[in-house]
Design a protein with these regions (language model features):
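Carbohydrate-active catalytic/glycan-binding domains of CAZyme proteins
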Residues: 1-290
Length: 290
């Protein structure tokens, strides 16, 4: 019998070309079962493209679930909505996080990190601005050359100015930030096409916005991977990711962030799940969806 306070893992994802927010849950971090009969709990209506891709769900201390997502292939805004129960949702909004950058081509895969030291939320995403980092202007698909940017907020109503979050000297998307004791881990996709990388790497820092080490070697294998999401399970890090050319979710596991074992054959997700994000949460907050 699972108790209300028992920790479980909640996985948010999309299917198809961006049909909306899907959820799955797991007690062991390996086998995820779809909630709501694998139907979207929310579909995108914000923005001209009305997409909802790469949904990231943050179960905040204010009692709400805060959701951000990629609202379109193009544009300078991200999608945002909140919910107390994952059933009833606020009106969807477009947050114009790159509105000040007229040449910005996109805003992809936003995520939320809660900064406990400053009691604020950090929203970060990948954008490509032509000519901003000329040394890698021709390294990506269709001339895209991404770096990571961020804003901060305490209430999801007012936001700081947009700042550069991470520039590792290469084309990067799909970063995910987690805290490990007193240090920060930044898992990311090396989006370089020439020469082909398309893999997941990790950088480490003792401070939140600067000081990240050069990312280590790829932690994923001989396939294209994106959309990493990292959780700690029984003292070891599991990183889930989208093997998007193979149409499956993969995973690797490590106890030291150096040596990684591929456990893709041991994880199970709903068919068709794409670019998901996992968070640890109490069973009480999702049991009504079972």
């Amino acid at each position: 019998m699972r108790g209300n306070s028992d920790p479980v893992f909640l996985f948010s994802y999309f299917k198809g070309h961006g049909d909306g927010l899907h959820l799955a849950w797991s007690g062991d971090g390996l086998t995820f079962e779809a909630l709501a009969n694998d139907q979207p709990l929310l579909t995108g209506v914000a923005g001209p493209e009305k997409l909802m891709r790469d949904p990231f769900l943050s179960p905040a201390n204010d009692g709400l679930f805060h959701l951000v997502w990629t609202a379109g292939w193009h544009g300078r805004a991200i999608g945002y909505a909140s919910s107390p129960d994952l059933i009833h949702w606020s009106c969807q909004e477009l947050l114009p996080v790159m509105g000040h950058e007229e040449d910005a081509r996109n805003c992809w895969a936003p995520e939320i990190f809660y900064d406990e030291d400053m009691a604020r939320y950090i929203i970060y995403w990948a954008s490509s601005i032509p000519g901003r980092f000329p040394q890698t202007d021709h390294s990506g698909d269709e001339g895209l050359n991404h770096r990571m940017y961020y804003v901060t907020t305490v209430d999801f109503k007012t936001f700081s100015e947009t700042r550069l979050f991470y520039d590792g000297g290469f084309n990067v998307i799909d970063a995910t930030l987690v805290k490990d004791g007193n240090r920060y881990l930044l898992f990311m996709k090396d989006e370089t096409l020439d020469p082909v990388c398309k893999n997941i790497r990790v950088a480490v820092s003792d401070t939140l916005f600067e000081g990240f080490t050069a990312p280590g070697p790829p932690i994923t294998g001989d396939y294209w991977a994106e959309g990493p999401s990292a959780v700690k399970v029984n003292g070891r890090w599991i990183v889930y990711f989208d093997k998007y050319k193979l149409n499956q979710i993969g995973a690797v596991i490590s106890s030291d962030l150096v040596h990684w074992e591929d456990i893709s054959d041991r994880v199970h997700f709903p068919a068709g799940a794409q670019h998901g994000s996992a968070v640890k949460i109490s069973f009480e907050r999702i049991k009504h969806l079972l």
